[in-house]
Amino acid sequence: MKLYLVRHGEAVSERINPERPLSPVGRKDVAKVAQFLKRAKLKVNEFYHSPLKRAQETAEIICNAIQPQGHLVSKDYLSPDDDIDKMISELSKRKEDLMIVSHLPFLLKLF
């Protein structure tokens, strides 16, 4: 199994929008990364993302570029300060490649 870790794109300020969706710059940056991954012929069928808007949008952009039929899955335990134990337990049972779109510091804990 290959595991791809992706931090969400730049989000708008909480002051501007409490849901913190991707900013226009964030959308553009993620689209560039998605096109790079497509040209690299990355094959991933499942994309886990946190329930937060910026991670969901990042996962959608990447999935649509590299695997339009891919499976997007929101996981409650991928938010910034969540413990990694549930993710580690799930990863230990997987055989298929997976992309996780989440946040710091959560992603740093997986290294």
Predicted regions and their residues:
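Active-site-proximal alpha-helix that buttresses catalytic centers in soluble enzyme cores
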Residues: K2-D82, L107
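A general, composition-driven signal for non-globular sequence regions
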Residues: M1-K2, D97
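Active-site-adjacent alpha-helix immediately C-terminal to a catalytic or transition-state-stabilizing loop
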Residues: I88-F111
